[in-house]
């Protein structure tokens, strides 16, 4: 499924749109990959009603709530440069109000060497990050990435692991953003692919062999498309593509502008007509 920048931003602004199905599908799986205990229904309830259902830790509640805000921020800023400041903003937003924030571990690059849990991959050291991240961002210009470029960026970003925590979620947010901006079918990692995702990512990072990782991402694209089709979302997106209509608010503004110009023209014509009649109605000296 491909959705353009303008289309996605329009969906976000519209009530009862496909956005309300795509957002929880992405977040539910991305968060579960990091241990969240929220079900998709519970996440939707939190997103739409602001109510928490189920038994969850305070940090899980806050991070899940924050992930909804981060998703919205990513959509709002589509088309803007992926800068270091943008990455840091995502990390700060994701952990706002959590114990990680209180301990001072968020809103900046990592200060202590870290690792990927359950992996033998040796990630970058804190001293590497100030140079490595700018190089990574420069190597993959915004809006011009192929499927392979996006996958390669993800492999490299996760290998750098620039933050003390939250790298997986931020990496998947970036992958989603890149897909939209570059016209690539959306990649949503399903939590049911947790083990192969981590295994093939590790293989790509340690050996440079990315074939299996590419295959997995293609499978995730196909699986996501099938889910959206079952929910009726594909039909909505196809109609959006076909219509090519401008957002109604934009069109309404244009119509109002046209009406204002027409009204001004009518007033001007009426004034000229009045002035013309006045000239003809003025009595001659002999008639006075």
For each feature predicted by the language model, list its residue ranges.
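FIC/Doc superfamily catalytic core
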Residues: 1-165, 169-288
């Amino acid at each position: 499924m491909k959705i353009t920048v303008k289309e996605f931003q329009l969906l976000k602004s519209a009530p009862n749109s496909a956005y309300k199905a795509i957002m929880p599908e992405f977040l539910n799986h991305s968060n579960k990959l990091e241990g969240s205990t929220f079900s998709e229904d519970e996440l939707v309830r939190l997103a739409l009603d602001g109510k928490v259902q189920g038994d969850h830790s305070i940090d899980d509640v806050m991070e899940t709530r924050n992930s909804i805000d981060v998703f919205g921020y990513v959509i709002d800023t589509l088309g803007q440069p992926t800068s270091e400041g943008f990455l840091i903003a995502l990390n700060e937003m994701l952990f706002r109000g959590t114990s990680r924030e209180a301990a001072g571990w968020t809103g900046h690059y990592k200060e202590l060497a870290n690792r990927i849990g359950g992996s033998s991959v040796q990630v970058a050291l804190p001293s590497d990050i100030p140079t490595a991240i700018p190089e990574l961002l420069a190597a993959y210009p915004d809006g011009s990435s192929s499927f392979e470029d996006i996958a390669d960026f993800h492999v490299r970003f996760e290998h750098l692991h620039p933050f003390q925590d939250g790298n997986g979620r931020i990496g998947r947010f970036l992958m989603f953003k890149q897909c939209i901006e570059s016209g690539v079918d959306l990649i949503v990692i399903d939590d049911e692919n947790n083990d192969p995702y981590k295994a093939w990512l590790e293989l790509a990072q340690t050996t440079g062999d990315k074939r299996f990782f590419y295959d997995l991402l293609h499978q995730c694209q196909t699986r996501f498309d099938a889910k959206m089709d079952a929910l009726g979302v594909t039909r909505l997106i196809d109609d959006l593509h076909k219509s090519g209509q401008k957002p109604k608010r934009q069109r309404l503004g244009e119509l109002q502008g046209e009406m204002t110009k027409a009204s001004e023209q009518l007033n001007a014509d009426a004034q000229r007509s009045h002035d013309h009649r006045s000239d003809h109605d003025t009595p001659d000296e002999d008639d006075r």
